[in-house]
Amino acid sequence: RFFDEDIGMKLRQWDMMELHAILEHRKKVGYNTPTFIKWVNTSAEENVKIFFINEIRLYNETESAPILAKQLNARSVEIRGEAIKTLGKLKYKEVEPKLIEMYNVQPEEVKRQIISAIADLKTDKALGFLYNAYDEADNWGTKRVILKALYEYSAMGRKTFDQLERKADSHTAILFAHTKHPLINQLN
């Protein structure tokens, strides 16, 4: 209720942890959790918006996904990245074409969030996009995220991964080894 009254409310990290603990406790004793999307849309503070986007993901508020998708146009890279991550985890497949469309004009961290979200969606419609994204990527971290997405995407994703591996040079071959090795994969 207090977020409805003060849209400019600032939260410190500790406040967010406390608020999350209160929400968890209320859930355990049988109270319904509120719908967080209204505070994403009304809060004036970036960190508060990000907190509520994370809560949407943690509480699997799939009904908030269509409204949350509007945050893909947020000026803040952090808000945009968290919205992308959350939409992927919520399996909001309708967002995939928009993610592909916006990919090339995003900073590297947002590109990685887009790739991870597409991997979470697993629509089998993005294999061509992932293949091209790998070919065009010049950042090794981004290439690594793309390879992991392909490797875990589907049987066709694995075939695409194998195809890229066959044409890899000695410099990029290490990325494929790191993606396939289960111990290294756990470090993500």
Describe the role of every protein-language-model region:
Residues R1-K10, V29-N41, E61-N73, Y92-N104, ...:
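Amphipathic alpha-helical scaffolding segments comprising HEAT/armadillo-like alpha-solenoid repeats
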Residues F3-R57, S76-V77, K85, Y103, ...:
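Alpha-solenoid helical repeat scaffolds
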Residues R12-M17, E45-N47, T62, V77-E78, ...:
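Alpha-helix N-cap/helix-start positions at coil->helix boundaries
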Residues M16-H20, P34, K49-I50, N54, ...:
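Alpha-solenoid HEAT/ARM repeat scaffold
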Residues A21-R26, E55-L58, T86-K89, A117-D120, ...:
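Core register positions within helices of long alpha-helical scaffolds
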Residues V77, G81-K85, P97, E101-E108, ...:
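Alpha-helical adaptor scaffolds
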Residues N104, E108-A155:
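Ankyrin-repeat and related helical/solenoid repeat scaffolds used for protein-protein interactions
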Residues L147-A168, I174-H181:
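Leucine-rich solenoid repeat scaffolds
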